[in-house]
Amino acid sequence: LGLEDFAGQPFVSLSVDDPYRRLIDERFAQAGVARTLRVETHSAAAVCAMVQQGLGLAIVNPVTAVAAASDRLVLRRLAFSIPFSVTALLPLYRPPLPEVAPMLEALGAETAHIAEQLKRLA
């Protein structure tokens, strides 16, 4: 999907103070594409739930999109990229807990799995 595919469509969005929302809005502004903002929420999972209920289209991060995909929520590849980062914060003055290393390994494996799922999108 290109930005122009969202023109005039009802759009479900993250709240205006969300950093990912700002990146999305910036892309639409640069392209001069106007969406019809229908509703805003603080959670990407809530955005997906609202789209499932037919309230409009949305752009959300790939982690949430893949987790929410169902027969009522169709994922489509964007013709452009909006970077999304996941960051692990570790203590500066002490070693991390022993559980951190396996958690980071699991996060890395899940990221690779999500990337593979996204490659198969139309």
Q: Where are the model-predicted features located?
A:
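Short Pro/Gly-enriched coil loops immediately N-terminal to beta-strands
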Residues: 1-7, 78-86
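Secondary-structure junction motif
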Residues: 1, 10-31, 96-98, 104-105, ...
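Hydrophobic hinge/microswitch elements
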Residues: 17-74
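C-terminal effector-binding regulatory domain of bacterial HTH transcription factors
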Residues: 62-71, 80-122
